[in-house]
């Protein structure tokens, strides 16, 4: 048996749902999708869900992951085994841990390949900071996986599809985190997973102010702007959602233009599936040139304006 009888899908990030649903179609005979509202439920059915389970009734001061108890109960009530697919977001991983505990299931994070053999999931993901690929065969009846971005192609919606909708009512867990305040995230919404052209900046750009040079290039060629982890996590020059690497975005654009990025393996595992890699770096020995199809050795601050002017003609 090379498929599960049932798969359960949930995504806290709407843009990740289509790829999870495509993976679900390949891995199981029946697709169940947990959603938070009616609009997400309608989308899930168009993407292939046979059953939609609307999570309902959570108080405003409680966290989404507090639904883990009723989600696990619902999963157990509809089969003695199954596969759970979640995005490898922070919330996805937290929810995976809670579901794993309640389902007595093995949990595997950041899966880049998933297959089913004899009714059991086999998972591959990066280990040792991206230096190797590890393979795990999950022996527990339930398997809970968080999936790396780009592991599956996005499913295409079909408005003619039909499915059943159910409601799962909130039940307060015995121990829970209460949210006391919410601060709006200062971020420009962008779906880098779908970008054809990506310009990505590293610390070699020199300063936060110099990122404007990369933004001008993006505008000239219709690209999206990304960055390396140090730019987002250490320097705080850009949003966390834009950094490319093993623990975040795994991109497959037609063009990946790396500006001032050294090319460490932890970054490149998120970019080396690009059709073409173009690197700009003032260090001729930078590892990025081992991956690049094309490269320029020089100061990005001087090269970017000239490149933008040439491509804008």
Swiss-Prot record:
Keywords: Electron transport, FAD, Flavoprotein, Transport. FAD binds at residues 255-283. InterPro entries: DHS-like_NAD/FAD-binding_dom, ETF_a/b_N, ETF_a/FixB, ETF_asu_C, ETF_asu_C_CS, FixB, Rossmann-like_a/b/a_fold. The keyword Electron transport applies. It comes from the Bacteria. GO terms for biological process: carnitine catabolic process; carnitine metabolic process; fatty acid beta-oxidation using acyl-CoA dehydrogenase. It holds the Pfam family ETF. The keyword Disulfide bond does not apply. Pathway: Amine and polyamine metabolism; carnitine metabolism. GO terms for molecular function: electron transfer activity; flavin adenine dinucleotide binding. NCBIfam families: PRK03363.1 (NF002889). PANTHER family: ELECTRON TRANSFER FLAVOPROTEIN ALPHA, PROTEIN FIXB-RELATED. Belongs to the ETF alpha-subunit/FixB family. Heterodimer of FixA and FixB. Required for anaerobic carnitine reduction. May bring reductant to CaiA. This is Protein FixB. The gene is fixB.
């Amino acid at each position: 048996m090379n498929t599960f009888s049932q798969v359960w899908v949930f995504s806290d990030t709407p843009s990740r749902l289509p790829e999870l649903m495509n993976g679900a179609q390949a891995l199981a005979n029946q697709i169940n999708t947990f959603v938070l509202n009616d609009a997400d439920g309608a989308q899930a059915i168009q993407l292939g869900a046979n059953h939609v389970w609307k999570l309902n009734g959570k108080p405003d001061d409680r966290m989404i992951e507090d639904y883990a108890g009723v989600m696990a109960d619902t999963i157990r009530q509809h089969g003695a085994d199954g596969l759970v697919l979640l995005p490898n977001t922070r919330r996805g991983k937290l929810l995976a841990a809670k579901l794993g505990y309640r389902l007595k299931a093995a949990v595997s994070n950041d899966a880049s390949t998933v297959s089913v053999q004899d009714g059991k999931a086999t998972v591959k993901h990066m280990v040792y900071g991206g230096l190797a690929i590890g393979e795990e065969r999950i022996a527990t009846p339930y398997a809970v996986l968080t999936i790396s971005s780009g592991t599956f192609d996005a499913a295409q919606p079909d408005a003619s599809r039909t499915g059943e909708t159910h409601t799962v009512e909130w039940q307060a867990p015995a121990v829970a985190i209460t949210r006391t305040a919410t601060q709006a995230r200062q971020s420009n919404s962008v779906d880098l997973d779908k970008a054809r052209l990506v310009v990505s900046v590293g610390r070699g750009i020199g300063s936060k102010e110099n990122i404007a040079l990369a933004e001008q290039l993006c505008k000239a060629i219709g690209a999206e702007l990304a960055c390396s982890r140090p730019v987002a996590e250490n320097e705080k020059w850009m949003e966390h959602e834009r950094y490319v690497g093993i623990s975040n975005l795994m991109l497959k654009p037609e063009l990946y233009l790396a500006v001032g990025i050294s090319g460490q393996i932890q970054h490149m595992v998120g970019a080396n599936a690009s059709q073409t890699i173009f690197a700009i770096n003032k260090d001729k020995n930078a590892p990025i040139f081992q991956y690049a199809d094309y490269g320029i050795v020089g100061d990005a601050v001087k090269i970017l304006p000239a490149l933008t002017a040439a491509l804008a003609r």
